[in-house]
């Protein structure tokens, strides 16, 4: 392992035990935050059917991550020092009599691929937190901020402030970071359990035909609401479009027009009687819930099927379709990554050889296998005819909507339900601070490791004299995260199946960055693009790590056929399959857009080409051999 450039350079202090290491990894996974922040993305991509396999897709993604986690854990036993898989690759190849010649190449490829993940992921987190902030603005100032469109100006400003604010926490050092992460984990997991229990209780208490709640312009009510035809800017009624963007026809061959709930002068939903006519609340027809199969799956006039909700609990955990599972698994990778982050904290660990392997697996099992599977079951089971999956895909925060519904039912009023949602939103915001902090800190430490090794500019390999944090890498990553966060929010509503409602707020907060309602059916979803870029970096890193694990234990006295061959081979093939699926899936799976995955793949390809050019030029300028002819002196 390379030494610091100067013997007087400060080094990190070992302060973390098993609990501290596990907490830091758990902060990056953040199950309470990701349920809120990715449910819309998972509901929308692959619509109108792929959302039915959300829970099983997470199971498959979890198996992929567990295979990779085992590889990380085993490697950390051999090489407990700092640097994550970047140094694992070097040490694994250098330990072999023939493969040692590829040590520097393998090390650089691993580190460069990890940057596609570790540099993009924080930007994605900054962006989704800005979306959360935009959603909450409507809750506090509904007359100023739209319930459909988050303010572009606000989100841009938020991305800048949030990115540098979190970077400052990371700059202060790992000890403060661990304390913050522990507090945030306790709060968000408690909030997660509360919501999940309430969600399951709501579904079990509201049987077929019972009176339930739905949202009308964001307000939870249990009665029918008067509707009128939605019109465009010229006053013409807007038709309901099918999956092929063609007007839907009724049984008589006439167009079906979009309808919207109406409100009174105070912004309250206008009640409707059994005939759909406006009336008073005491005469309003009750809103009844349905879970029947014919309601769970609906067809338009062209025969296109849309999944709305799960008719039974068994349906929630079912795979439904191989293609749908792949779509959901490839997106779900975003919510599971982070377990490997503790391997970059080898220098901060008190007993790295013993504690890091345990922390890698523990963090994934606790949050992935327990928290995620429970909360995603609860959220999917809660869906019904009052709030279906298409509603979730068109919402800026579907989990926030569901919290309003369940809170209104449990506490007896919309005001109480809204307050319940705001409390939960606060815990999500805290979790996002912890998540962004953890991934930014991890990314900075990987860059620090490469900078200390002079594979990237050496100033990245310096530690701050007082805080002992890789300050150059942290502030650089903060700038990148702010930029990528802005890209994430620029068209986060793109890829809609149907046109959105027209913008109803016209002020400085919406002076730019808003497209026509129809444009959102054609524009790519930038949130999904950034997610997939990060995920492709993850797939490359995890594939490489599995290969490194195979190489490291080949002909080693600790070799175990299952842990060191079967498991990493499975992880390698599973990650590769996810990458390849995005090449072929858009051409064969209805509802899977070709735009987002191919843009993301293009970015990944450009990053790889640039990395190779940089590596070759750097090797020539420094006189380093790309292919080693002899093992370096220890």
Where are these regions (language model features)?
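Hydrophobic alpha-helical segments and their helix-loop junctions in multi-pass secondary transporters
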Residues: 131-134, 186-236, 246, 254, ...
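Membrane-helix boundary/coupling elements in multi-pass transport proteins
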Residues: 81-85, 113-131, 331, 336-348, ...
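Extracellular loop-to-transmembrane helix junctions
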Residues: 31-150, 154-158, 366, 599-611
């Amino acid at each position: 392992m390379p030494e610091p450039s100067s013997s007087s350079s400060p080094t990190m202090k070992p302060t973390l035990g098993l609990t501290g290491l596990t907490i830091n990894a758990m902060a990056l996974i953040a199950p309470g935050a990701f349920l809120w922040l990715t449910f819309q993305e998972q509901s929308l991509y692959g619509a109108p059917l792929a959302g039915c396999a959300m829970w099983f897709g997470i199971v498959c993604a979890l198996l992929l991550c567990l295979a990779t986690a085992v590889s990380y854990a085993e490697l950390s036993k051999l090489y407990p020092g700092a640097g994550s898989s970047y140094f694992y690759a070097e040490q694994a190849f250098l330990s072999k009599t023939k493969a040692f010649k590829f040590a520097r190449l393998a090390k650089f490829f691993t580190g460069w691929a990890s940057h596609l993940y570790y540099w993009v992921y924080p930007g994605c987190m900054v962006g989704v937190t800005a979306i959360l902030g935009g959603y909450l603005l409507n809750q506090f100032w509904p007359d100023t901020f739209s319930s459909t469109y988050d303010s572009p100006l606000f989100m841009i400003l938020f991305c800048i402030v949030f990115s540098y604010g979190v970077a400052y926490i990371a700059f202060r050092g790992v000890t403060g970071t661990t304390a913050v992460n522990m507090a945030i984990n306790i709060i968000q997991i408690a909030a997660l359990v509360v919501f999940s229990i309430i969600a399951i209780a709501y579904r079990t208490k509201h049987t077929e035909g019972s009176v339930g709640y739905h949202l009308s312009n964001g307000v939870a009510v249990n009665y029918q609401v008067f509707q009128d035809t939605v019109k465009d800017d010229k006053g013409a009624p807007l038709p309901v479009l099918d999956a092929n963007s063609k007007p839907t026809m009724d049984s008589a061959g006439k167009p079906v027009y979009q309808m919207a709930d109406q409100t009174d002068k105070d912004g309250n939903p206008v009640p409707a009687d059994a005939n759909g006519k406006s009336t008073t609340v005491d005469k309003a027809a009750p809103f009844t819930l349905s879970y029947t199969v014919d309601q769970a799956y609906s067809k338009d006039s062209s025969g296109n099927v849309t999944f709305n909700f799960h008719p039974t609990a068994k349906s929630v955990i079912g795979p439904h379709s191989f293609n749908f599972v792949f779509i959901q698994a490839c997106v779900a990778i975003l919510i599971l990554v982070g377990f490997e982050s503790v391997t970059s904290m080898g220098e901060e660990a008190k007993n790295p050889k013993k504690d890091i392997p345990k922390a890698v697996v523990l963090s994934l099992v606790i949050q992935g296998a327990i928290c995620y599977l429970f909360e995603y079951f609860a959220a999917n089971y809660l869906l019904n005819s009052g709030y279906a999956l298409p509603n979730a895909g068109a919402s800026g925060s579907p989990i926030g909507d569901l919290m309003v519904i369940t809170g209104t039912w449990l506490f007896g009023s919309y005001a109480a339900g809204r307050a319940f949602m705001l409390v939960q939103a606060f815990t999500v915001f805290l979790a996002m601070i912890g998540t962004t902090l953890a991934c930014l800190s991890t990314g900075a430490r990987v860059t620090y490791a490469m900078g200390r090794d002079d594979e990237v500019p050496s100033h990245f390999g310096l530690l701050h004299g007082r805080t002992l944090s890789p300050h150059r890498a942290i502030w650089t990553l903060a700038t990148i995260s702010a930029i990528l966060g802005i890209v994430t929010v620029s068209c986060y509503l793109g890829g809609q199946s149907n046109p959105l409602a027209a913008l109803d707020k016209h002020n400085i907060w919406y002076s730019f960055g808003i497209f026509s309602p129809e444009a959102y059916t054609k524009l790519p979803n930038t949130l999904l693009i950034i997610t997939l870029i990060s995920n492709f970096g993850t797939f490359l890193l995890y594939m490489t790590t599995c290969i490194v694990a195979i190489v490291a234990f080949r002909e080693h006295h600790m070799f175990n056929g299952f842990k060191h061959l079967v498991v990493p081979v499975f992880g390698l093939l599973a990650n590769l399959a996810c990458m390849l699926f995005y090449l072929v899936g858009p051409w064969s799976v209805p509802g899977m857009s070709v735009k987002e995955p191919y843009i993301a793949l293009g970015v990944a390809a450009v990053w790889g080409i640039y990395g190779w050019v940089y590596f070759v030029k750097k090797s020539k300028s420094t006189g380093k051999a790309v292919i080693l002819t002899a093992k370096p002196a220890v």
